[in-house]
Amino acid sequence: MKELKGSKTEANLMAAFAGESQARNKYTYFASKARKEGFVQIADIFEETANNEKEHAKIWFKLLHNGIGSTEDNLLAAAEGENYEWTDMYKQFAEEAHEEGFENIAKLFEGVAKIEKEHEERYRALLENVKTGAVFERKSETVWQCANCGHIYVGTTA
């Protein structure tokens, strides 16, 4: 197979992924608004379409990334993405908003950057738990609840 990297097709896949991802979010917001306004059937159709768009985006994502990685790989990728967002992207966006006099937007960018930093820390902690085998283990007694049946267990391991 030809090399995808640097090709127009790669750029098109990235645009398709971005477009489908944005459409999914937009339709989810539209569904929420329709539901609040009492248009349940319309909300359901927006949600159904949002789920379709999610699946379309997944096709393009898998082609761009040769599938979906392991949980360990995905946690690292997520942490790195969050790091970029809070250290570079939102920092630059906030500076530019300040320069242009959009103080309220600059503050929002700065606030979201702080949240992205927390996201990075959370992903890195989860990654460490996976690497050390501590996902289902705690140092002190913890309440564990089965996500399937709801059974409650108290102990240091799930």
Name every feature range the model reports, one short phrase each.
Residues M1-A158:
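Non-heme di-metal
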